[in-house]
Amino acid sequence: MAGSSRRAGGRRLQLPLLCLLLQGATAILFAVFVRYNHETDAALWHWGNHSNPDNEFYFRYPSFQDVHTMIFVGFGFLMAFLQRYGFSSVGFTFLLAAFALQWSTLVQGFLHTFHGGHIHIGVESMINADFCAGAVLISFGAILGKTGPAQLLLMALLEVVLFGLNEFVLLSLLGVKDAGGSMTIHTFGAYFGLVLSRVLYRPQLEKSKHRQSSVYHSDLFAMIGTIFLWIFWPSFNSAPTPLGDGQHRTALNTYYSLTASTLSTFALSALVGRDGRLDMVHVQNAALAGGVVVGTSAEMMLTPFGALAAGFLAGTVSTLGFKFFTPILESKFKIQDTCGVHNLHGMPGVLGALLGVLVAGLATHDSYGEGLESVFPLIAEGQRSSTSQALHQLFGLFVTLIFASVGGGLGGLLLRLPFLDSPPDSQCYEDQIYWEVPEEHADLAQGSLRPEEPDTQA
């Protein structure tokens, strides 16, 4: 009972104090450093005698709306498949993303838009912050149900910094192309989360295994998340690309890649399923792999056929990963990947990076014409050959894996600090620990909750 009281006291204090501390610090930094850019500042915009329809808002905000919906609705409901963790899946997604948006605005601002002593923000800053939040939520998926909200906020605090540094190295220093984030978002977020999960490994998690499954209605909620993500993914990949043919091509390639990954998912799920039955886990996740795999190459001249082939391959690999590789990750590598982020984001992200290497290596002036300057400016300017660009793309993948692995290890050590509240092994994947729940849920939960025991992270 004493241990239970101490845990309850920690929950009562840790989250409020950390939220207030982080929000207060962020607000001070915003007051000191953050300013509107020339397209959002009233004086600067009108001083330039610009026409309002020329403002970037009108071109970027529709894409931002789609990306924003993906982050808060798509990711949140996709992770709501656990039978007793729906409040936490959607609610902690809301909390993490809200903090990550503010913190990443500062981190990315210092790295990309800092001049004259200030960070200058506009609609593009909002899109980039959403991308960073997406990486954080991917990592959250790997440890879903096994951590407390205070731990998750500290994870986001560290991960946003490392995401920003990795993105800066790849895009600004190495000149890597990765508009849809196969490397910077999906690969980074997945392997950060997987290494984090390994450091937080719980040998006695079997005590909560009965809750690590879905019920009929929770799978339907997760499918809502899938549909939102699937519909808006072309906007996600095309949001940061140059306006015009580049953005058009990116949306088109993503669109067809998603259709192919969906068909391959249904085909493989029935093929490997018991009695030829479809598995909702496969459909919820692997059907989205087509959006991940073309994240790097969608703005390139991938060709419609290439988009279909990439999507079909990604859906196949992802489905087989859920069926065969996820159990091996836990039994052999001690990685407890709750949402299967390795199958949806990790492997398709790496495949997407390698596809980018291939397509970049094939880039020529004949195939791109004057458009080469917007897609591969260093090749167009004669500073690089296509082969050199391809090698830089490959090196960018290795850099991302290093950042993710080291960052995940550091994050795991941070989250293992003994004073941080986390659910005991017997109470993982349970909303009632952190939320007021309806009485019928509480009655069901009480029957399965066991007395609190010490954590067994090894």
From Swiss-Prot:
It holds the Pfam family Ammonium_transp. It catalyses: NH4(+)(in) = NH4(+)(out); methylamine(out) = methylamine(in); CO2(out) = CO2(in). N-glycosylated. It is found in: Cell membrane; Basolateral cell membrane. The gene is RHBG. Keywords: Ammonia transport, Cell membrane, Glycoprotein, Membrane, Transmembrane, Transmembrane helix, Transport. Belongs to the ammonium transporter (TC 2.A.49) family. Rh subfamily. One of its GO terms (biological process) is transepithelial ammonium transport. This is Ammonium transporter Rh type B.
